[in-house]
């Protein structure tokens, strides 16, 4: 018997995706991204400084922070104060690595962009929503830098490629994309895929949670994730008024 998705989606169907830009007043880039019932607030802030290892190089940097609000899940989670959990540290490193792939740091100049991803409501796929929404916030922050006269249009944009991410997994032997929490908790295999607009992979995280997976299953997961990510890239372009 095949798995019945809780929201009656097909195996390859994404949850409803939306981006509400300029969600906050002060950050140069901000967006409320929704993957179904997963809601993440992504902001991109700019500081005219770089980490010590980049000083006097003329290059910029991007870093990311990720947190989940206590009431984002069905059971309240304590705030992480002095020490991050291993999960939080792993996720924010993933977000940072993924979004750094979108930038040419020589063109960004000697400044740091910090992308903050705050999960307001969690129903699976928070890290992939954070990456996908984080790119939209990053794009708006770069636009803000141009408006401030901090970037020279003649030198070309620091943004070199779009980036989006999607979860994919195997539940009761069936490959599914964009897993909700119920599906994620039942998955035999859980993966997170990050790609750019050229269809190249930035990161693949895959774990056999309850069962091993075959090479054909791996290829099927990658193909279905790639198709779903193309939909997310198009949704980003529509939100940014960059439709092709």
UniProtKB/Swiss-Prot annotation:
EC numbers for this chain: 2.7.7.56
Residues annotated as binding phosphate: 87, 125-127
CDD domains documented for this protein: RNase_PH_bact
UniProt catalytic activity: tRNA(n+1) + phosphate = tRNA(n) + a ribonucleoside 5'-diphosphate
GO molecular function: 3'-5'-RNA exonuclease activity; tRNA binding; tRNA nucleotidyltransferase activity
Swiss-Prot/TrEMBL GO biological process terms: rRNA catabolic process; rRNA processing; tRNA processing
SUBUNIT field: Homohexameric ring arranged as a trimer of dimers.
NCBIfam families hit by this protein: RNasePH
Name the record gives this protein: Ribonuclease PH
Organism expressing this protein natively: Synechococcus sp. (strain JA-2-3B'a(2-13))
Gene designation per UniProt: rph
